[in-house]
């Protein structure tokens, strides 16, 4: 789920307006886009890449490490299952509001496969200086800068804001992982945290969470075991109960998934929790200052 230069990307829905725009941005940024999928335009070329009738057909002609889904909710299930059948390793699903029954059917199909779903409703993956997949502004050097801080976020906009604050403070990113804001997703905060813990380029991790669900609490238990420092910002401190705030998964119901419980779990695990995104950058600067002092002694 960490994008690396040279991984090949198939864009399902490449000929649509959004698919075209973002595929061009990905290519400009260095992402290796090897083809697109549109059953009605198979055999054509679009923005310089070949169009296939399906992901399975594409996999017969070229290596497909990652697929990105620019497909409407009602059709997303078939596109994702096509990518699973093609043996694609990582399927980045940008589509929001994929029907829950469809998501459960997709997860059942994943069993026994080598595929992983990132999303639904993810903004994508970014590795500054190497490329990006999805709809994050990975091409914007004011937002993303190569470095050693891994960032995990359920929200694309909050993830962008966090990376902007980090970059302005001089803290570059080793990877950005957008896990998605829908209630049922294929890659959790814990999954992403474990991946960044294993990543040799990452020396610190920022977890951008939000109200709803219990993913941050589960990630906190793992963070307790990590040697790398973990910091967090949780959005939704003032959100009223039983009201969806932005994402379908961002809702506090029956006293579960609230801001206070998430913050308490993270702090018990030794995670430093910020009140604002800008404060995270200050925490990282404190660590860098202490390390320089220790090195000089």
Predicted regions and their residues:
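Catalytic-core regions of core metabolic enzymes
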Residues: 1-297
